[in-house]
């Protein structure tokens, strides 16, 4: 397995130092999420500040940007990074798309399928010089003149999609080059639900022979400290309160937990939510281990399930020893 890092930052000024540290330690990739910042701006700084490490968005919101805009962003980043950029796309949930971004909502799986195919159609037009002619569900792209065509660049751009439930997993298998497993997962859910759905998508699209990477971000509780355990419980409670993620809980017979957490969240009783995350739930969703055993336990947990692994906690230069231990264990 490859070892990646999730990069979080308060200001863009921090990005070069963080990604240079990740590259110096031998990590394989850095990923930028779309929470309080635009991940593409951070990816530009990462590309300019490094020479080897791969750079990706995990994830950028697909439904708040047009496919053509996504195509331009990824094309320029692939050129700037000399082929190190990976485009990771996700859906978010309806409330954020409609109420935070003011954009229309549509069924996410068909829309993601159309978005990825449209991005590839734009790239194909730029590569070949042929007229742009994409006709998908609720979308047509038919205008691309030489004036608006960027200079050629030789690098392939892998597209990763993300999701939790089977429909988006199947779409990833149909149209993507890899899949970001949501941090709110268990190995059982990954093995029993996510991977079979991806396989069905790949079989449907007759894409079973090409490469496809499974990217996992894992919750961790290292050395059993209360601070670490409480942080994991808070994050798990937040995700478990989201109705869209209820299927993961249902796979373990914990539907009632999700319903109770949703009620608390709707009433703003955030401080109480983490108390509902029992030790059994914590151990199902998180890697709980002493520091010296952490790398080996992570490797065994995801052996045969993942191709790339990172830990959910934000990357920090103070974690050098932890990441070196992780790299040594996971790559053996």
Which residues are covered by each model-predicted region?
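Active-site-adjacent structural elements that line small-molecule/cofactor binding pockets in enzymes
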Residues: 1-332
């Amino acid at each position: 397995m490859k070892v990646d890092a999730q990069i979080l930052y308060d200001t863009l000024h921090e990005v070069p130092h963080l990604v240079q540290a990740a590259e110096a330690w031998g990590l394989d990739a850095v990923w930028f999420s779309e929470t309080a910042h635009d991940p593409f701006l951070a990816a530009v700084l990462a590309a300019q500040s490094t020479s080897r490490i791969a750079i990706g968005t995990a994830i950028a919101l697909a439904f708040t940007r047009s496919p053509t805009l996504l195509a331009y962003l990824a094309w320029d980043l692939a050129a700037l990074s000399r082929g190190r950029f990976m485009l990771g796309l996700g859906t978010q949930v309806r409330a954020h798309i409609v109420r935070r971004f003011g954009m229309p909502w549509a069924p996410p799986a068909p829309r993601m399928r159309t978005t990825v195919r449209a991005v590839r159609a734009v790239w194909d037009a730029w590569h070949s010089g042929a007229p742009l002619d994409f006709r998908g569900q609720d979308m047509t792209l038919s205008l691309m003149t030489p004036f608006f065509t960027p200079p050629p660049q030789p690098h392939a751009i892998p597209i990763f999609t993300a999701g939790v439930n089977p429909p988006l997993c199947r779409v990833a298998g149909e149209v993507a080059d890899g899949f970001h497993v949501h941090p709110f997962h268990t190995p059982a859910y990954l093995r029993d639900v996510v991977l079979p759905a991806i396989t069905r998508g790949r079989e449907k699209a007759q894409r079973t022979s090409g490469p496809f990477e499974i990217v996992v971000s894992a919750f961790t509780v290292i050395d059993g400290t209360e601070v670490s355990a409480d942080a994991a419980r808070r994050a798990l409670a937040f995700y478990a309160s989201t109705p869209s993620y209820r299927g993961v809980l249902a796979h373990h017979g914990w539907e009632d937990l999700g319903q109770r957490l949703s009620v608390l969240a709707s009433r703003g009783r955030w401080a109480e939510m983490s108390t509902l995350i029992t030790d059994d739930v914590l151990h199902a969703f998180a890697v709980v281990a002493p520091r010296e055993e952490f790398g080996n336990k992570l490797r065994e947990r995801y052996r045969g399930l993942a191709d790339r692994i990172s830990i959910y906690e934000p990357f920090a230069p103070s974690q050098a020893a932890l990441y070196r231990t992780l790299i040594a264990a996971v790559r053996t």
